[in-house]
């Protein structure tokens, strides 16, 4: 699905693994993020493909879950042939691989890398142009995180990738591992609490058509002071329900 509204606690309970299939940018709101955190903490699993690390940069929990963030990739061309090493062939997702092999894809450099992950495959930067991570360049990994499981593979930029038996078996093995954890258990204590639904809040507009508001302060008596960039200082009086300009610093 491309519908983030599916990220509710009741719906996520139906799935053993949630796949982020080359997502990019911000895809979930705070309610949906909350539901997904609780899903993982209840024993759910995450599977990230390629651009899944180019997703939700401001959500620190997700970065740790995914294992890192996209930093860059080669250009001109962005898709190249590279030499890989399966550094751990005891895992179900890599057991079928030779120790070293070549394949073609778009190779990410990563930042904010989670050093607690267990790396499965690395990339030799001497085998292609414009790599920026140096001698140690992870490309696929897994770990147990915050009560659940997470697996990530950087492969998957090109359509041809999904015609390669080696890649398909790698993905299938990763999915099998991710799905093999304990059953979901929402009855145990979860670190992330539930958020009330948006329709349970009442929103009141106190002022509008502001001219570049910059600062806001709330007094113990409930009055709200806020400034505008051009110098006006305004005050909202909750007893009168009105706004007035109390100073002009222009």
For each feature predicted by the language model, list its residue ranges.
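Aromatic-Pro/Gly-enriched surface loop or interdomain linker
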Residues: 1-15, 183, 189-192
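Alpha-helical scaffolding within the catalytic cores
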Residues: 2-8, 34, 134-140
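Solvent-exposed loop/turn segments at secondary-structure junctions
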Residues: 4-6, 19, 23-27, 46, ...
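Short alpha-beta junction capping motif
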Residues: 11-56, 147
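Glycine-rich, charge-decorated loop segments at or immediately adjacent to ligand/cofactor-binding or catalytic sites
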Residues: 54-65
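Catalytic beta-strand/loop cores that center a nucleophilic Ser/Cys/Thr
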Residues: 68, 73-147
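Extracellular ligand-binding/catalytic regions of CAZymes and related secreted enzymes
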Residues: 127-137, 144-194
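Beta-propeller domains with acidic blade repeats across secreted/periplasmic ectodomains
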Residues: 190-250
